[in-house]
């Protein structure tokens, strides 16, 4: 389930507090913003998510090439990016983007990896139209906000979801 911030009060400390609950297996805090990305003369607008390295495992989303960012990238607030298939195709066509620099907002980011293409959903939603950067980089360089927009919370066991949701509400 997701814990969402209706105000600007959900923080990384809140995510840590949720993570410490005995029924919680994983917490993935995130920020989200729609941004224009540029590579040479090509450009696109896509969703940029600031997430933690655990995002990939929590979402069970494999990489088709390259690698995901690390805890060290988070600590250093590195300008690195993992591209979804849609922005990768729009910016690079059939060319290999790994190691290339793309512009997001007013800064350049090095492409580390490519997410496996999922394809359009039945409702027409494109889950591949996204990019991922370290959450700390998003907070300090992109959104300039100290709060997070939401956090994906995974209970230790499906039977614990209701209890976990109640515990999160109590915080």
Label for each model-derived stretch:
Residues 1-47, 51-57, 89-90, 139-140, ...:
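Hydrophobic, regular-secondary-structure patches
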Residues 49-73, 77-171:
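Mid-to-C-terminal secondary-structure elements
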């Amino acid at each position: 389930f997701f814990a969402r911030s209706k105000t600007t009060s959900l923080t990384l400390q809140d995510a840590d507090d949720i993570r410490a609950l005995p029924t919680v297996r994983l917490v993935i805090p995130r920020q989200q913003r729609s941004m224009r990305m540029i590579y040479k003369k090509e450009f696109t607008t896509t969703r940029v998510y600031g997430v933690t390295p655990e995002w990939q495992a929590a979402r069970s989303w494999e990489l088709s090439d390259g690698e995901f960012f690390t805890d060290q990238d988070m600590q250093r607030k590195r300008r690195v990016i993992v591209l979804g298939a849609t922005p990768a195709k729009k910016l690079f066509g059939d060319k290999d983007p790994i190691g290339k620099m793309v512009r997001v907002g007013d800064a350049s980011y090095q492409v580390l990896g490519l997410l496996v293409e999922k394809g359009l959903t039945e409702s027409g939603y494109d889950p591949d139209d996204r990019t991922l950067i370290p959450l700390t980089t998003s907070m300090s360089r992109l959104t300039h906000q100290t709060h997070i927009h939401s956090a994906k919370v995974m209970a230790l066991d499906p039977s614990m979801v209701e209890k976990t949701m109640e515990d999160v509400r109590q915080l």
